[in-house]
Amino acid sequence: MLQPKRTKYRKQQKGRMKGLSQRGHRLSNGTFGIKSMDSSFVTARQIEAARIAATRYMKREGSIWIKIFPDKPITKKPLEVRMGKGKGAVEYWAAVVKPGRIMFEIGGVPMDVAKEALRLAAQKLPVRTKFVVARDYQE
């Protein structure tokens, strides 16, 4: 699963997800992609599940690019522990996804294959998504 090799600080504050995605809102590698319509934390497990769903359907044809990376540590205190006594340990890693962010890109396959592969991938993600096609695409 994806996670940073090393970070400057072990823990982060939760932060707020307001506004639209400032970067990563255009297709850069592939011809087809899925764009986020909501804001949410997408965990490393969800990204991996979506990747597996898409690659299984594509049967090793074409290429898939994951355009989000889980670089935010999400902490959790153990069960039945009273409040206070510091912040909990890092439980998992998540990527902050805002509306407009391209999450996955696919290239080298026909449109119907890409559409179905990305639909299967989108079912594994906690955000509403939209299928997008590159401007210079010709069938």
Curated annotation (Swiss-Prot):
Composition bias type Basic residues, residue spans: 1-17
Chain segments carrying region Disordered: 1-25
GO biological process: translation
PANTHER family assigned: 50S/60S RIBOSOMAL PROTEIN L16 (PTHR12220), LARGE RIBOSOMAL SUBUNIT PROTEIN UL16M (PTHR12220:SF13)
Family to which the UniProt record says this protein belongs: Belongs to the universal ribosomal protein uL16 family.
Function: Binds 23S rRNA and is also seen to make contacts with the A and possibly P site tRNAs.
Record's protein name: Large ribosomal subunit protein uL16
Organism of origin: Christiangramia forsetii (strain DSM 17595 / CGMCC 1.15422 / KT0803) (Gramella forsetii)
Lineage, broadest ranks: Bacteria, Pseudomonadati, Bacteroidota, Flavobacteriia, Flavobacteriales
